[in-house]
Amino acid sequence: IEEALQSGGTVIGISSGGKLEKLISENEESLFLSVPGGQMPRSAFGHLFGRQLSVCWALGIIEKPDDKEILKMIERLRSSSTDFDISGGNGLVVSVAKSMLNRQIGIIAPTILIPAARRFANQLNENSNVFARPSELPEMNHNEIVAWSSANENEHSIIYFSCENIHSRVHSRMNWMLENIDNDSSWIIDC
């Protein structure tokens, strides 16, 4: 960051303060955005992501939805948060978690969702002391599919990330895997 600032670059920084705030605040061409302090990054995700999204909207990197669409997004988040609440939700999160106990976890996602799959795998690896790895469809190769289909189904769980915008061929591959890979702990998460 110091090098970027010294070379005349503009920096947008997001943090809860500290050295980053001091560096950026001293530069008139840069912008510092504060988030609440005292949280580990994984628990501050909403604050960090919200700031990043706002910057991308403001700079035109991502088209900002209209107010009606933003309200629909908030409602979907609220609904998901209620449904997936561990103590008062619909029980799905608890069922998924129990089915994954003492198993390696494979997260299979189309290209458009691989960043989310990678982030989810990292969270599981760090916070749950389990081995999780993401695999990308359609890039997953024949050898990996053979390994999935020949593995002992009690040793691993498979989580498929899906969404309505995936390519029809990728959707076909995912359906093939669901039909042909025996596993009593397979879940589809519709993103």
Give names to the regions the model predicted.
Residues 14-17, 110, 137, 163, ...:
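Fold-independent oxyanion-binding glycine-rich loops
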Residues 154-164:
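Active-site pocket-lining segment
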Residues 39, 57-155:
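Active-site phosphate/pyrophosphate-binding segments
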Residues 11, 32, 105-106, 158:
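Short, well-ordered beta-strand core segments
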